[in-house]
Amino acid sequence: MSKQILYQDDARKALEKGMDILTEAVSVTLGPKGRNVVLEKKFGAPQIINDGVTIAKEISLENHIENTGVALIRQAASKTNDVAGDGTTTATVLASAIVKQGMRNVAAGSNPMAIKKGIEKATNFVVSKIAEYAKPVEDTKAIIQVASLSSGNDIEVGKMIANAIEKVGREGVISLEEGKSTNTILEITEGMQFEKGFISPYFVTDTERMEVLQENPFILFTDKKITLVQQELVPLLEQIAKTSRPLLIIAEDIEKEALATIVVNKLRGILNVVAVRAPGFGDRRKSLLEDMSILTNGQVITEDAGLSLDTVQLDMLGKARRVIVTKDSTTIIADGHEIKVKSRCEQIKRQIETSDSLYEREKLQERLAKLSGGVAVIKVGAATETEMKDKKLRLGDAINATKAAIEEGIVPGGGATNVHISSELFTWAKNNLVEDELIGALIVERAVTYPLRRIAFNAGDNGAVIVEKVKSHDFHIGYDAANGNIVNMYDRGIIDPAKVARSALQNAASIAAMVLTTECIVVDKVDD
């Protein structure tokens, strides 16, 4: 196919146009008075949502070059979502603001490479200041505030997530399920999560969330490498196919030929199956597999116990209520086998007491926490499917934001932190940078005020006036868009996780700097 090539300003302007279209669509959702966006779906009802990254993923333009701009800014949103789980709209607004101002300066003759350096130095300065000002999350009140804010100012959701974290611990697993009623309820069940995801993306059942969801599955645990599918697994697969229940395979590894056979069975709809590599190494892997088998009332198929794959019966397999597998993790939600789990926990506690090695004790503590903590399941209630999808997205954001807050602390929300730091950045840049590097830093200094401007605009206020008002106060003072007041953000509970604020700026600056240093675009030419 022939290509279309654009250079310099033409290239950057085409990218900027695509970025503007996406930013406008996403930024209408920013703040407590942000509006919703309706997404048309090829199948099923339209989706009404308020989530930046979901909107960004849906936007695709006819013009190839503008679409490249959309894809670039979408990357800033997606990366922020992957790292912090929230702050995607802020990242989009920041990236767009840096690009717009940078383009003006490049057109006026500034050196793009020097501007890029200035942007990077300014970003590092702001990130270090966010870390310096962040307050650790010490009480349940702060957790409720973060969760409420991220779920769209829903205090009940905030309390529910705080309650869930209290029950399963700060490292615990919180899972979302679609409920059967209109009420959202919290349930604590036995279960555990480990950091290994599906071996092949062909196993995915929910392509939108890129995860595998299995209800009431069998689980095969083995410390062996699965090689000859015909001899080893076929008898078992045939037994499971008769039950019409899904299967989760947790093994040391699966060879290519064996994996191909399993994937083909999955794609043909013969068997709903997913394969995952077992966590850990050596003896620790065996112990973790045993923990999981006890949790699910199954057996580990290991040669140490004289068992082989070709003799496996259904009653040797683990059973779970639900399994969720993403590319990075596997969550098993089990049904009560409390007595067995308790005695296993007691056994691990005794091992901790008798162990001399600090490393060994740490790993045992980790196992104990995973096994005894359980999983908090929030059953999301809604009147319609459209409301259900929106609620699940908001709850997902709230859970991610809460975990991010626990990790790196909290700062004043509503764009206030960036506005206060922008004054310090201005002074620092004037004293430490010169020429085009200084221009790059001042671009960031102005850009970081844009999220607050947009929050104020969405609430019907003048963004520039609000920014100046906030700047004239102390660090903890900001703008409460819901009520239109200048308030103490900590007292009012308008707080952001430091990790979200940091990630949004880092990813936005990274993408924006790349766009400003773009000199040529090559895209497929559309034939008339």
Swiss-Prot record:
Catalytic activity: ATP + H2O + a folded polypeptide = ADP + phosphate + an unfolded polypeptide
Source organism, top-level taxon: Eukaryota
GO molecular function, one term: ATP binding
Keywords: ATP-binding, Chaperone, Chloroplast, Isomerase, Nucleotide-binding, Plastid
PROSITE patterns for the chain: CHAPERONINS_CPN60 (PS00296)
Chain residues that bind ATP: T29, L30, G31, P32, D86, G87, T88, T89, T90, G414, D480, A481, A482, D496
Protein EC: 5.6.1.7
Enzyme class: isomerase
GO biological process: protein refolding
Family matches, as InterPro entries: Chaperonin_Cpn60_CS, Cpn60/GroEL, Cpn60/GroEL/TCP-1, GroEL-like_apical_dom_sf, GROEL-like_equatorial_sf, TCP-1-like_intermed_sf
Record's keyword annotation contains Chaperone: yes
Predominant cellular place of this UniProt entry's protein: plastid
Compartments in which it is found: Plastid, Chloroplast
GO cellular component, one term: chloroplast
Family: Belongs to the chaperonin (HSP60) family.
UniProt-listed NCBIfam families: GroEL, PRK00013.1, PRK12849.1, PRK12850.1, PRK12851.1
Cited function: Together with its co-chaperonin GroES, plays an essential role in assisting protein folding. The GroEL-GroES system forms a nano-cage that allows encapsulation of the non-native substrate proteins and provides a physical environment optimized to promote and accelerate protein folding.
Subunit structure, as described in the record: Forms a cylinder of 14 subunits composed of two heptameric rings stacked back-to-back. Interacts with the co-chaperonin GroES.
HAMAP family: CH60 (MF_00600)
Protein's name in the database: Chaperonin GroEL, chloroplastic
